[in-house]
């Protein structure tokens, strides 16, 4: 009988090299088809075994809580670890075909026939992100079906696919932000090789692929790390999602940094978007964000690391060495401008041409000003002068800003927003890095609602938790808020691809193609230097001017209700009169309500 291990035992020195595949936990196929090495770390179990294809085998202790066994089985073998007689899923599993509570499958990453050897990544300045939820992007909701849409995205003019989280989570549907087994791609979307095929196909078309990862919490069902060692977690801090991940524990750091490397190395993703980085709490000497950036940039090639962070901290780039930041202020000022809405966190924004001009010029709205919203009272943000324009990721819609509304309605479906205003939204012509959400380019009629698949008390708790989280928005108290656990809520959110070629959908799609073509081909707009940009306003007309050695471009967006002639707009410079684009497709220099033009 194996003796009880001390709390948080230290693995042998040979297991401190994170990059060495010979020290990986989980199931690792051996070279030449010689079998599979099964390995785990536990601080609590007295007896340890592995059950492979129904047969149980006692594992050998290597000291320091490490157990190992090599068996003559290959890819496709199913297994569970057995801790003190209890069958326990592997939190390092590379695939969980039957879900997060089931057996893992041995996966050999080396058998996929990659064809992207000539792909060397994408620079952030060249990125036009297109956010995709695999389950609702196509009727089938699979990796293979998503791959069939890649030629359309290439023709549209986007350059990088931003995939919502894929780490395995409980249930048959969900957004992905309740991942429980970080190393296993979500099985209902397809097998690991299907995901590899999606990335490979994108690279063949010249499209980058980025993955959204969640390293601030685990989902409420299906995470078994604490069964192996409670020290993965801590009560020194917590979040709305539960106990904190203890990044002072070397195995937790290794779990996350190794996971990041896996997505980039084994699946060929071009970069990662880190969800909610304010909640990646770490009191270690080197913050986990800094270590992640170092790990990713040392992989070779062009790999990018982006943060979703509302704090407006340039240090994320200048100190932690991340590459870019999903910022909220541009979206929030745009939404308040178009809708007049000032509930919840929108209360901190005033909207209008002047506010948008300031936000675009400075990168974000808050750079040290006082923030007093939702019970918070503090200075927010710091000046962003050290950042380049591409460091800011701008959007007018994303999964949160649509899905966290009571009915999951899109911006153009909001009260008071006309299609003229929606089409006039200017993010694609700014030097910041733009992001579109699936279907945005044709003003999709389908919502994107919050959905999950948790039964019983857990499902009820998730639903009630959302109402509490967004209690500052009056719509969440209504009886018409969709039930997140109902399958129909998920089905409602699937894109209707048939509508995009008709009526106003087709008209909007043509505009997005034209905007992205200009962004790509225009010699002035293609220059992303922030110092070339000036902004201002004349009443309700926002102007954004870009001047480079290649010429001058001026964007004018009428945010008022009165029609304005471009010649009548008072500007501190002479306005060029050559029309390059009118958001309503006209050939005149007149701005109706919500309309925009680009001149140069």
Swiss-Prot record:
GO cellular component, one term: cytoplasm
UniProt organism field: Deinococcus radiodurans (strain ATCC 13939 / DSM 20539 / JCM 16871 / CCUG 27074 / LMG 4051 / NBRC 15346 / NCIMB 9279 / VKM B-1422 / R1)
Example GO BP: trehalose biosynthetic process
UniProt key word Membrane: no
Cellular localisation: Cytoplasm
Family as reported in the entry's similarity comment: Belongs to the glycosyl hydrolase 13 family.
Keywords carried by this UniProt record: Carbohydrate metabolism, Cytoplasm, Glycosidase, Hydrolase
Coiled coil: none
Annotated positions binding substrate: 273-278, 328-332, 376, 399-404
Catalyzed chemical reaction(s): hydrolysis of (1->4)-alpha-D-glucosidic linkage in 4-alpha-D-[(1->4)-alpha-D-glucanosyl]n trehalose to yield trehalose and (1->4)-alpha-D-glucan
UniProt GO molecular function: 4-alpha-D-(1->4)-alpha-D-glucanotrehalose trehalohydrolase activity
Site feature: Transition state stabilizer: 400
Pathway terms, separated by semicolons: Glycan biosynthesis; trehalose biosynthesis
Protein name: Malto-oligosyltrehalose trehalohydrolase
Matches recorded under Pfam families: Alpha-amylase, CBM_48, DUF3459
Assembly information from the UniProt record: Monomer.
InterPro entries, per database record: DUF3459 (IPR022567), Glyco_hydro_13_cat_dom (IPR006047), Glyco_hydro_13_N (IPR004193), Glyco_hydro_b (IPR013780), Glycoside_hydrolase_SF (IPR017853), Ig-like_fold (IPR013783), Ig_E-set (IPR014756), Trehalose_TreZ (IPR012768)
Region called Disordered, residue ranges: 1-34
Active site, per annotation: 275 (nucleophile), 308 (proton donor)
Record EC number: 3.2.1.141
Lineage: Bacteria, Thermotogati, Deinococcota, Deinococci, Deinococcales
């Amino acid at each position: 009988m194996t003796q009880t291990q001390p709390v948080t035992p230290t693995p042998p020195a040979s297991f401190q090299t994170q990059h060495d595949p010979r020290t990986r936990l989980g199931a690792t196929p051996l070279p030449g088809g010689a079998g599979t090495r099964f390995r785990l770390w536990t601080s609590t179990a007295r007896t340890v075994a592995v059950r492979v294809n129904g047969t149980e085998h006692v594992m050998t202790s290597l000291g320091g809580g490490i157990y190992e066994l090599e068996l003559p089985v290959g890819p496709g073998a199913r297994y569970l670890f057995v801790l003190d007689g209890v069958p326990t899923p592997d939190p390092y599993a590379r695939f969980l075909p039957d879900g997060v509570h089931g057996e893992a499958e041995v996966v050999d990453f080396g058998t996929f026939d990659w064809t992207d050897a000539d792909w060397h990544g994408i620079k952030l300045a060249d990125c036009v992100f297109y956010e995709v939820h695999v389950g609702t992007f196509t009727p089938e909701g699979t990796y293979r079906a998503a791959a069939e849409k890649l030629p359309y995205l290439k023709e549209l003019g986007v350059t990088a696919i931003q995939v919502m989280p894929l780490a395995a989570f409980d249930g048959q549907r969900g957004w992905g932000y309740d991942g429980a087994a970080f190393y296993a791609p979500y099985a209902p979307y397809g097998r690991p090789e299907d995901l590899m095929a999606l990335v490979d196909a994108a690279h063949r078309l010249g499209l980058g692929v980025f993955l959204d990862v969640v390293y601030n919490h685990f989902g409420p069902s299906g995470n078994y790390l604490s069964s192996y060692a409670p020290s993965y977690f801590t009560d020194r801090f917590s979040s709305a999602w539960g106990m904190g991940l203890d990044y002072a524990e070397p195995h937790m750091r290794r779990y996350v940094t190794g996971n990041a490397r896996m997505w980039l190395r084994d699946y060929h993703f071009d970069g990662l978007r880190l969800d909610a980085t304010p909640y990646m709490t770490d009191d270690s000497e080197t913050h986990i964000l800094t270590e992640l950036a170092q790990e990713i940039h040392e992989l070779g090639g062009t790999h990018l690391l982006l943060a979703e962070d509302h704090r407006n901290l340039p240090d994320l780039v200048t100190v932690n060495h991340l590459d870019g930041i999903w910022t909220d202020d541009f979206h929030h000022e745009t939404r308040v401008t178009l809708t007049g809405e000032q509930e919840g966190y929108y209360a901190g924004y005033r909207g209008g041409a002047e506010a948008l001009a300031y936000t675009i010029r400075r990168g974000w709205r808050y750079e040290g000003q006082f923030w007093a919203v939702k019970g918070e009272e503090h200075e927010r943000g710091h000046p962003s002068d050290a950042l380049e324009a591409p460091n800011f990721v701008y959007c007018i819609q994303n999964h949160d800003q649509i899905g966290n509304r009571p009915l999951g309605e899109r911006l153009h479906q909001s009260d008071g927003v006309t299609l003229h205003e929606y089409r006039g939204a200017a993010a694609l012509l700014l030097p910041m890095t733009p992001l579109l959400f699936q279907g945005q380019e044709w003003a999709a009629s389908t919502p994107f609602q919050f959905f999950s698949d948790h039964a019983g008390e857990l499902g009820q708790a998730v639903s009630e938790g959302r109402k509490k989280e967004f209690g500052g928005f009056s719509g969440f108290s209504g009886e018409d808020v969709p039930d997140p656990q109902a399958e129909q809520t998920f089905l409602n959110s699937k894109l209707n691809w048939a509508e995009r070629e008709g009526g106003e959908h087709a008209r909007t799609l043509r505009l997005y193609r034209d905007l992205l073509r200009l962004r790509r081909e225009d010699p002035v707009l293609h220059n992303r230097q922030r110092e070339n940009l000036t902004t201002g306003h004349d009443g309700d007309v926002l102007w954004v001017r870009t001047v480079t050695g290649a010429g001058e471009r001026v964007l004018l967006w009428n945010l008022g209700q009165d029609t304005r002639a471009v010649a009548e707009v008072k500007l501190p410079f002479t306005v060029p009169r050559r029309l390059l684009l009118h958001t309503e497709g006209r050939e005149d220099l007149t701005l109706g309500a919500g309309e925009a033009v680009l001149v140069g």
